[in-house]
């Protein structure tokens, strides 16, 4: 094996070095403290699980992104987590089994067999929050507001948000009686805004339903889109109108809370269609070709764990958040250089200093005070009689 092969990392797999690793850890603590202040409880999920458990309730996209291995003890197939959200849903539905609303949050590394987008990391640090047990738009507004508060905490500039609702397309597709194959083809065409394909795929449908499905292609833009949707989808089935009402209610409350936030609506944007069941949302910033935070409602996932529960939430990549954020993350600087000594009084003083939050670095045999600079120390412990004093490091 060539020497280069011993240190070469796979594409999309990164190591994080100081001081960036410290900045990420400080940001992680700040965001989790924010979540806690909103009532969200922290949970930790396993890095690897049996595959059928890991992928329960998830779409095919997650299956393709999951690294798979064979457990040498059981012989069963296992997977490294590619998304923490289904694991947290299982905790709520199967482990906690609470009756009322439950708020959970998490932060941890995930591993992707395939990158989410070109040049994306395959080892992001996924961070997010989930709210279970309430199906009202108020829950969606809460998690979106928390997501935006997180971005404000990180001081990510120039954010704008996309909002949609998969229930609008799903309700129209069911009313049209589309087969699974045609529904998937129409879904793909809508994502590409391929109007000619949409027209062809809806040619044999009742004219009113065909017209409403075709309208989804260009029902995108600012707040006026929702007013236009009320007119163009006026004859839609009740579930479609209910979905539109929910989207309107969410949009109005967000506009009141965040009047400076640009909102963009796309009723043909079906991000996570096979996974989400209601409102879907994503945050974008200029110069980044993919969303930096995203989420939505996924009420069906708990049923796969034996207990259906309404659910809504969001996630982001902590490393991306730190990279894009302009908030000043203050890292501890400086430290105290401790000589290599067996003096008991020195040890007692060092323990006291560390308990007070001071950073104390011990010299190793043969190291001189000059090594203290390399260890980012600006002070040193010097013995005066029986006592040790903290003094500035000599130039």
From Swiss-Prot:
Pathway: Amino-acid biosynthesis; L-histidine biosynthesis; L-histidine from 5-phospho-alpha-D-ribose 1-diphosphate: step 1/9. The keyword Amino-acid biosynthesis applies. It is found in: Cytoplasm. One of its GO terms (biological process) is L-histidine biosynthetic process. One of its GO terms (cellular component) is cytoplasm. Its main location: cytoplasm. The keyword Amino-acid biosynthesis applies. Coiled coil: none annotated. Pfam families: tRNA-synt_His. Keywords: Amino-acid biosynthesis, Cytoplasm, Histidine biosynthesis. This function is generally fulfilled by the C-terminal part of HisG, which is missing in some bacteria such as this one. Required for the first step of histidine biosynthesis. May allow the feedback regulation of ATP phosphoribosyltransferase activity by histidine. Belongs to the class-II aminoacyl-tRNA synthetase family. HisZ subfamily. HAMAP family: HisZ. Heteromultimer composed of HisG and HisZ subunits. This is ATP phosphoribosyltransferase regulatory subunit. It comes from Pseudomonas syringae pv. tomato (strain ATCC BAA-871 / DC3000).
């Amino acid at each position: 094996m060539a020497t280069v092969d011993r240190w070469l990392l796979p594409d999309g797999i990164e190591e994080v070095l100081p001081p960036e690793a410290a900045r990420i850890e400080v940001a992680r603590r700040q965001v989790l403290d924010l979540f806690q202040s909103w009532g969200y409880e922290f949970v930790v999920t396993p890095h690897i699980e049996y595959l059928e458990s890991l992928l329960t309730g998830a779409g095919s996209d997650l299956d393709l992104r999951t690294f798979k291995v064979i457990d040498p003890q059981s012989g069963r197939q296992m997977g490294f987590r590619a998304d923490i959200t289904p694991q947290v849903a299982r905790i709520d539905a199967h482990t906690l089994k609470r009756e009322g609303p439950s708020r959970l949050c998490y932060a941890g590394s995930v591993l992707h067999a395939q990158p989410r987008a070109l040049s994306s990391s395959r080892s992001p640090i996924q961070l997010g929050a989930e709210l279970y047990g309430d199906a009202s738009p108020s829950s969606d507004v809460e998690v979106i507001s928390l997501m935006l508060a997180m971005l404000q905490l990180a001081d990510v500039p120039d954010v704008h948000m996309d909002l949609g609702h998969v229930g609008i397309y799903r309700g129209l597709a069911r009313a049209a009686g589309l087969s699974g194959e045609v529904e998937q083809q129409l879904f793909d065409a809508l994502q590409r805004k391929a109007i000619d394909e949409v027209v062809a795929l809806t040619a044999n449908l009742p004219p009113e339903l065909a017209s409403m499905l075709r309208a989804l292609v260009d029902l995108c833009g600012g707040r006026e889109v929702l007013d236009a949707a009320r007119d163009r989808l006026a004859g839609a089935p009740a579930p479609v109108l209910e979905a539109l009402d929910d989207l309107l209610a969410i949009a109005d409350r967000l506009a009141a809370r965040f009047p400076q936030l640009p909102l963009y609506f796309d009723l043909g944007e079906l991000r996570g269609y096979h996974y989400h069941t209601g409102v879907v949302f994503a945050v974008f910033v200029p110069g980044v070709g993919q969303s930096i935070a995203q989420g939505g409602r996924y009420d069906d996932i708990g049923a796969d764990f034996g207990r259906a529960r309404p659910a809504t939430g969001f996630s982001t990549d902590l490393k991306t958040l730190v990279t894009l954020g302009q908030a000043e993350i203050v890292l501890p600087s400086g430290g105290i250089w401790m000589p290599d000594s067996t003096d008991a009084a020195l040890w007692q003083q060092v323990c006291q200093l560390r308990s007070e939050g001071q950073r104390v670095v011990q010299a190793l045999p043969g190291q001189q005070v000059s090594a203290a600079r390399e260890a980012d120390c600006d002070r040193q412990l010097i013995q005066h009689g029986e006592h040790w004093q903290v003094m500035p490091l000599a130039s």
